Amino acid sequence: MKKIVIILASMLALVAMTSCEDLLEEKNYGNPTVESMMSAEENVVLLVGQAYADTKWLHDHWGYWGVASLTSDECVCPVRMPGEHWKDNYYWTRLNNHNWNWMGDAFKNIWNTTISGAVLCNKLLATLADAKESMKAEVYAQYVGELEVLRSYYYYMLFDCFGRIPYLEEFVDKTEPLMEPEQVWSHLVNCLERNAPNMAVVTDANRAANYGRVTQGFAYALLARLYLNAESFGCTPENIGLANNKDFREDFVSIQSPADFYTNAVKCCDKVINAGSYSIEDDWFANFKIDNSASKENIFVIVENGNGEFDLRYIGSMSNKLRVPILTLHYSHQSVYSMVEKPWNGFAARPGFMERYNEKDLRGPGPIPPAAPEPPARPAKMTDAELAEYNKKLEAEYHGPLKEYAKTVQGYGTQSAKQWGWFIGPVFDKNGEIILDENKIGSICRIEIASLEAANWYDGARCTKYEVDKAGQYQYAENDFVLMRYADVLWMKEEAILRGGAGTSGFNTPDFQKMLTRTMAYEQNPKEAFAAAYPGVVTLQLEDILDERGREFAWECVRRRDLIRFGKFADSDYVDYVTAKQKFREWFPIPYSVLEKSKINEETGERYWKQNEGYDDIP
């Protein structure tokens, strides 16, 4: 069975599935109460399943994934010429160079959808509380834990973006000043530590039933992420009093020094590792296949359905469907890959990011083909007559060399016999000719990008870690989107130890070594190839771990926070195109539409909710 799909309509089926003949008979079934329905665990599963609906907004380019990726070194969306594709009033450009402001739907979308998910969790928790007496104690504890951990994840995504957020653990209409980052961090840590022991532990027997749901492994992995990033969130031993004041700490240490944050991160990782629920896949790409539900490395995913007619919803331009392959691939990929939806030729990798891959690393672009012939410079605007003359010039000066070039790059690009994490090179037709785009230019993706504001259609490497549907079955991506991987747990542990956390390194364990060597699977001796390619990783140099995390987790929603943690977020020598370097940009601006709705404090006459430091508040 490929996946467990959570369908809200299933709840209605409990009372609606009767035949016409049954309806004609006068039978009194009584009026089932919520309490009586909750006595059956399968009904609790359906009820709690509703809370996952808002996770599907997280991976859109108009949502969390978009801003997390575009503001880091792993992703860029340049304005493409001719036609000013993706200009959008330079919205994407401002994310790329860190000059964003409060305008832009993504910030509003992130706020609204994560809050919506958290509020629904609180509402369902209230429903469970009302029915507590009719439920088994262990069932109640497990599903309360599931909802509280999922709520923590919604809040975490909001917190990661804005820092100061309206954190509530009950279903009430209540307005208070936004909670400060260190307070939010403390509440999240408390909630996760309290609930993790009650969560389902994944085994081979229950893996399918827990697929796409938060589990104990996820709770501890998210907790590890909070501890590892505590200092980047502004937490200190002195300002997190709540996190040190509890009676359910288990074996976590009290935070008396910065090193204690990292010790607890190690402990969280060890809980995931020692549970034996997860393992590193032999094939890195197994985690991102069209059907990746068999992966034992993926801890938490968004369960997708690529059928455009199934549960397709929009919020403005944002959709609840996975559109990563459509976002990144060149327009010409559609005919070669038999894609239902024409790609949008937008998102790509920043050139500096691609330099961090060894050409033997399958997560990268692979061997770089020879440089393609350059087409004649094209004026930004032309009359019809000038365009006709330009096309004649292309035919005379460019198309001939392009045909000759095609003969020298057979086996590259779409003809590659090997799978790579990024696409560069020619897009060939079935006859081995390079496909011309609508401008009669060869579709040859390259690593280089001319500029943020005037890139070519073919500029930038395209992310292909998620398997592309080449059978034309799905309008959108059917691959389940990965939110947490076991590989991340292994790397978080090693980094936490290097930062001063107490614990025993797992670097030489079979899983960790497999995680490294599988990246060189095309080589005769993968271990030697990895050591030669990335010596700083093998010797566990902290700066090299940042590079390795980039290679391993590209476009998986972790890079922005990684850069902030390593002090590289505003480093223009490390992150291409960054021009704004203010410290306050480590948080995003709270949307005006949110601030405008803030209630007024009757004592002060001011709004309860204030803008983040550095950004313009509402006049």
Residue map of PLM features:
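Long, intrinsically disordered, low-complexity segments
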Residues: 19-20, 114-117, 249, 274, ...
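An aromatic- and glycine-enriched ligand-binding surface/loop that stacks and positions planar moieties
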Residues: 21-92, 165, 193, 213-220, ...
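Bacterial Sec-type N-terminal signal peptides, specifically the leucine/valine-rich hydrophobic h-region
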Residues: 14-17
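Conserved, well-structured interaction surfaces
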Residues: 40-59, 63, 83-162, 172-211, ...
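C-terminal substrate/ligand-recognition segments
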Residues: 104, 108, 362-366, 370-515
